[in-house]
Amino acid sequence: MLENLSTEHRNEKTMNLDEMSIKEVLQSMNEEDRTVALAVEKEIEQIEKVVQTVIKSFEEEGRLIYIGAGTSGRLGILDAVECPPTFGTDDKMVQGYIAGGLKAFTKAVEGAEDREELAEEDLKSIGLNEKDTVIGIAASGRTPYVIGGLKYAQSVGASTASISCNKNAEISKYAKLNVEVETGAEILTGSTRLKAGTAQKLVLNMISTASMIGVGKVYKNLMVDVQSTNEKLVERSKRIIMEATGASYEVAAEYYEKAERNVKAAIVMVLLQCEYGEALEKLKYAKGFVKKAL
């Protein structure tokens, strides 16, 4: 029942929210937000297991698929679309699906989250298989769309995980791994786009970033698979080469172009003083890990 969920409880500290000054409202929000990272910290071990599962999928050329409704679905899509420019992935490697389809990203689609079959249809449309990992996201932990998606994922042998903001969440029954970040009552009762949404974003950041590190998308703490899709990222790419090799801006820029704007290859070329083709071979042999290629 909805009233039993901690995310639906009234926050005792903000009973007079409508009477607070603007500054008091902001201070209350800030105070509550401080608790979110601590709540996430309690779930690190579970998040680690999820990351290990995602890495295994990636190593087997499987995909990471997020499913959710409302804010939860939007956060999954947000994390997914950041992976290609940040980590050089193709747009199929990490995907996000929201109840009601992409139009629901900007406008609520009434009743979509209550239909389990919609998630099954979404996952069937991409040929979900046993190599993939599906992560269901729901602050309440009871969204039918997410439950339907997790059920279907299990039926085809895909790995499954859930992210919710209540303990003993309903969706946890349908996923092998469960991340339950108990964020408690919101300052505005039931508005889970607040602390619960923040917690979900933090967890998704962890999962995608740690998984990409696990498949060689990072060298030291540098995003060496960054895609130079605009002038800012072109400059960042050159700076990454400089940081990784100690080369001057001019040398970094030269090798960046020699490597056909492949940052990883440019780093290997500078440090090993080799040609582009040899750098690519070394990276291929090292499965994309710069450190191993060196």
UniProtKB/Swiss-Prot annotation:
Specify the SIS domain's residue ranges: 54-217
Metabolic or biological pathway, per its Swiss-Prot or TrEMBL entry = Amino-sugar metabolism; N-acetylmuramate degradation
InterPro entries under this entry? Answer: Etherase_MurQ (IPR005488), Glucokinase_regulatory_CS (IPR005486), MURQ/GCKR (IPR040190), SIS_dom (IPR001347), SIS_dom_sf (IPR046348)
Catalytic activity reads:
N-acetyl-D-muramate 6-phosphate + H2O = N-acetyl-D-glucosamine 6-phosphate + (R)-lactate
EC number in record: 4.2.1.126
Example GO molecular function term?
Answer: carbohydrate derivative binding
GO annotations under biological process?
amino sugar catabolic process; N-acetylmuramic acid catabolic process; peptidoglycan turnover
State the SUPFAM superfamilies in the record.
Answer: SIS domain (SSF53697)
The residues annotated as the active site are: 82, 113
Name the domain of life. Answer: Bacteria
A Pfam short name:
GKRP_SIS_N
Write the record's keywords in alphabetical order, separated by commas.
Answer: Carbohydrate metabolism, Lyase
- Which NCBIfam families does UniProt cross-reference here? N-acetylmuramic acid 6-phosphate etherase, PRK05441.1, PRK12570.1
Could you tell me what this protein does? Specifically catalyzes the cleavage of the D-lactyl ether substituent of MurNAc 6-phosphate, producing GlcNAc 6-phosphate and D-lactate.
Query: Quaternary form?
Result: Homodimer.
Additional free-text comment from the UniProt record: A lyase-type mechanism (elimination/hydration) is suggested for the cleavage of the lactyl ether bond of MurNAc 6-phosphate, with the formation of an alpha,beta-unsaturated aldehyde intermediate with (E)-stereochemistry, followed by the syn addition of water to give product.
Give the protein family: Belongs to the GCKR-like family. MurNAc-6-P etherase subfamily.
- The identity of this protein, by name, is N-acetylmuramic acid 6-phosphate etherase
The organism of origin for this protein: Bacillus cereus (strain G9842)
